[in-house]
Amino acid sequence: MSESLSVLLTNDDGIDAVGIQALYQAFDDIAEVTVVAPTDDQSAVGRQLSSDVTIHEHDWGYGIDGTPADCVVAGVEALCPDVDLVIAGCNKGANIGAYVLGRSGTVSAAVESTFFDVPAMAVSMYIPGGGDTPWHKQATEVSAFADASRAATYLARHAFDAGVFEQADYLNINAPVAANEPATLEVTRPSRVYDMTAEHDGNGTVTLHDRVWERMRTDDIPDPSGTDRRAVVDGHISVSPLAAPHTTEHHEALDALASTYLDSI
């Protein structure tokens, strides 16, 4: 499959970000790659969609004045149809935990792809932050994304023949910053740990704070083995096989309420 693999590559950090450059260089050796990515930073926009977007020619494909979801729709339907795989990333910053997935532009691009029945991978890299070097000055070179690139290309080459996408709609991959030795790969599930807080200052402002990230830096997390966050904090590559959202199951209690609705009016 890898010899004829056709890939649409997008992200939410913008087409000039180092993370998408790292994946483009890695996949250019094994696939036919077309980049369709936002022209500017679209982090945390979720699946926000536009009605019209302006496209710009780029050496790697196209820049889009829009969101990651816009890029997938425009790419799959108009700019590079018949792709085998959509890859979003590599995001500079992890996308882990069940509550994060719907916010992430990176993951949302992968989700958008699944509604076209095109398998996808969302690829992100965990940067602990803290310390003497500001977060935005970390992982500024392609080499920092080596683990993420290795994992993504490995899975792209082998997942189809292994039947992975017969059971999963998309893969959410989170890797550490590359070290001297390659990181190991673990199959995980999204963590359910949630630690958002809000403080009202009494003067018209409520400050929202996600405490999970600072707790991760000190390993002060209750996430059990087998979760994406635990794997990443322990220095492993996390791969979560996921289905597109909004699935449903038979619900007897709701059936009972529905059956008596008209009687209540």
From Swiss-Prot:
Q: Which GO terms describe its molecular function?
A: 5'-nucleotidase activity; metal ion binding; nucleotide binding
**Known EC number:** 3.1.3.5
In terms of superkingdom, the source organism counts as Archaea
User: Gene3D superfamilies annotated for this entry?
Assistant: Survival protein SurE-like phosphatase/nucleotidase
Subcellular location per UniProt equals:
Cytoplasm
User: Per the record, what is one GO cellular component?
Assistant: cytoplasm
Which reaction equations make up its catalytic activity?
a ribonucleoside 5'-phosphate + H2O = a ribonucleoside + phosphate
Give me the comment on cofactor binding. Answer: Binds 1 divalent metal cation per subunit.
Supply the NCBIfam families for this chain. surE (TIGR00087)
Q: What does this protein do?
A: Nucleotidase that shows phosphatase activity on nucleoside 5'-monophosphates.
Family, per entry: Belongs to the SurE nucleotidase family.
Specify the protein name.
5'-nucleotidase SurE
Q: Which organism is it from?
A: Haloquadratum walsbyi (strain DSM 16790 / HBSQ001)
